[in-house]
């Protein structure tokens, strides 16, 4: 990741262009677009990718992980429907960019990362930024039972199923956005899952995506 946290006029200009590109791609939630405009994506990338930081593409961040393309971050965040003050659980901290977008929107963000090296690298970056994110090294399938319940849960990796432990940690009326492995095993379908009053789940599908797999346990890659 980039150790230079400078955010200059050029970076801000590129972010404005990115926001307009996302608007053209169908992102309509102004709170999401404002957050994308506020969070400096280039600081989460390796210095060799800084010049490309505001293009709509994913980049490797080490430990076999990627930073999702901005349109995917914006799409998932828009589906989540975050309101200021909500408790949001993120599974897969990765670079920390998605967590900062959520924090910029006023969410109380709790984020789990399973890759030890990536966890500490990202934690160091986050501590130098103005966005408040609580990070945890752990297994995303288990969630954070001691911090439950959550208003929103966002998963940033492809999951084979909806983890039962995470459902238990959702408030009634809470929403989970999760990329679920499709039947062919060649990608994911984006699901919006709402927990109803009787405890059942309402599931809505929102198109095909490609994510790294959601893995169990703590990794040392």
Where is each model-derived feature located?
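Conserved nucleotide-cofactor-binding alpha/beta core module
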Residues: 81-201
């Amino acid at each position: 990741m980039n150790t230079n946290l400078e955010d200059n006029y050029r970076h801000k200009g590129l972010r404005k262009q990115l926001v307009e590109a996302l608007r053209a791609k169908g992102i309509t939630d102004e709170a999401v677009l404002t957050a994308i405009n506020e969070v400096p994506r280039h600081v989460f990338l390796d210095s060799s990718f800084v010049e490309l930081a505001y293009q709509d593409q994913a980049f490797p961040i080490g430990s076999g992980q990627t930073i999702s393309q901005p349109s995917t971050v914006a799409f998932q965040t828009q589906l989540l429907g975050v309101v200021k003050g909500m408790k949001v659980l993120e599974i897969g901290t990765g670079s920390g960019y998605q967590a900062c977008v959520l924090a910029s929107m006023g969410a109380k963000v709790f984020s789990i990362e399973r890759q030890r090296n990536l966890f500490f690298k990202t934690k160091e970056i986050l501590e130098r930024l103005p966005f408040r994110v609580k990070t945890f090294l752990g297994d995303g399938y288990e969630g954070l039972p001691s911090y439950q319940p959550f208003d929103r849960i966002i998963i940033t990796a492809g999951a084979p199923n909806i983890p039962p432990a995470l459902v238990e940690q959702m408030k009634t009326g809470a929403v989970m956005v999760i990329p679920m492995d499709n039947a062919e095993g060649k990608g994911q379908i984006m699901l919006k899952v709402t927990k109803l009053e009787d405890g059942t789940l309402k599931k809505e599908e929102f198109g095909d995506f490609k994510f790294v797999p959601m893995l169990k346990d703590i990794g040392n890659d």
